[in-house]
Design a protein with these regions (language model features):
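His/Asp/Glu-rich mid-to-C-terminal helical/loop segments that flank catalytic regions of hydrolases
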Residues: 341-375
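Extreme N-terminal flexible tails
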Residues: 1-101, 105
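A short beta-strand motif that forms part of the nucleic acid-binding face
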Residues: 58, 111, 164
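Short, Φ-rich (hydrophobic/aromatic) sequence segments
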Residues: 39-41, 122, 291-294, 363, ...
């Protein structure tokens, strides 16, 4: 039996794999950082119909150790169809078990979104009416950061921005973007026609390609948490944020959505800008309208989420707060779970890539309703 992680988004360290019933592994920390939680590895040479038991021995020292309670790892035989496997967390680590049907299995923290799939998504997007590669930034290690613009009407005047996967381990964020982009392919979608008559979309499907490739949880290749770099981005340590900010200055912003995943909270929710110094009753009304409209479409809810911050005490190094304050616009962080969505559980898959895609499409419906109210 061989355990490998030498591939896109791979992350694992093998301690002892001599006994299939007591396989001991550890998660490698992020590059230039002590954060860790994301794992993704492949096991070859498994004995079908024999129970294999895995333990991540350093799970208790991970970035969000409390998040392991109630979490179920994901597995796949083909890298396409992922399912949850029985998992338990205790003082000795995270344990999960599988009696495989085949000899090769992948395990991961969440359904991975590969760089290869990202490239196919961008190429497919460029074949959609009105979509162009407006600009391309460069990551610390030289990977492309594509900014796509969707513009179908010369009189459209609003600029709606959606960025994803600032935190590289949050792969549900690019699944969200895939769903959003796929919806733009529908020629008879009246909601999208209404939205794009008034607004252009500015899309960054993956903000942190280096971190995602290397199997990081939180940081880029320089050890920088991009969602703590917006107040003073650096062309050296956070060129990903610096690039997007330059493009925002060039084109303007009328709405901003930052797409994320949350390790601990088993719900879909949003965090707004209520703690910003520039927060106004207008923005409060827009936040309420957005939440109401998105909640009416299924998976989103408002009972669970982050505690509201005190007025005027915002951390402007966060993207949502910085952009909302700078451009006086509706700005949200959209969070999806690594676990299941407890309001609508699907035990076989938990929250998944497919559900993330549907949420992306529901967000477009919400924007179509709100487009006349944004300014």
């Amino acid at each position: 039996m061989q355990i490998r992680a030498d591939f896109d988004s791979g992350n694992i360290q093998v301690i002892d794999a001599s006994d299939p019933r007591r396989i001991r592994l550890a998660i490698r920390p992020d590059l230039a950082s002590q954060h860790f939680q994301w794992f993704h590895f492949k096991v070859e040479g498994m004995a079908p119909a024999t129970e294999h038991c895995f333990t991540l021995v350093n799970a208790g020292q991970s970035a969000y150790s409390h998040a392991w309670s109630g979490y179920q790892a994901v597995a796949s035989y083909d890298g396409e169809r992922w399912f949850r496997v029985p998992s338990q967390y205790d003082a000795d680590g995270l344990h999960f078990q599988l009696e495989p049907e085949e000899s090769e299995v992948r395990f991961a923290y969440f359904e991975p979104y590969s760089r290869e799939r990202h490239a196919r998504l961008v190429e497919r997007a460029l074949g959609i009416e009105g979509v162009e590669r407006l600009a391309v930034g460069t990551s610390v290690q030289g990977r492309d950061i594509e900014l796509l613009r969707v513009r179908r009407h010369p009189d459209s005047h609003l600029k709606l921005w959606v960025i994803a996967q600032q935190h590289p381990g949050e792969h549900m964020a690019e699944w969200f973007m895939e769903g959003l982009i796929e919806r733009l392919q529908r020629p008879d979608d009246t909601e999208m026609q209404r939205l794009l008559e008034k607004a252009d979309l500015y899309l960054v499907p993956n903000m942190n390609p280096d971190g995602a490739f290397h199997g990081n949880l939180r940081t880029n290749a320089a050890g920088q948490d991009l969602n703590r770099a917006w107040l003073e981005p650096s062309a050296e340590r956070s060129p990903e944020v610096w690039f997007v900010q330059q493009e925002m200055k060039r084109h303007g912003v009328d709405l901003f959505l930052d797409i994320h995943g949350d390790e601990e909270i088993p719900h879909v929710f949003a965090a707004g800008c209520e703690s910003n110094p520039g927060y106004t009753p207008r923005l409060e009304r827009l936040e309420q309208r957005f939440r109401e409209e998105l909640m009416a479409r299924g998976e989103f809810q408002i009972r669970h989420g982050y505690p509201r911050s005190a007025p005027g005490q915002a951390n402007l190094a966060l993207a949502c707060n910085f952009v909302g304050q700078t451009y006086d616009c509706l700005a949200f962080t959209i969070e999806m779970p690594f676990k299941d969505h407890d309001d609508n559980p699907e035990p076989g898959t938990g929250w998944s890539g497919a559900r993330s895609k549907r949420l992306g499409q529901d967000v477009l419906s919400t924007l179509a309703v709100l487009v006349d109210e944004l300014r």
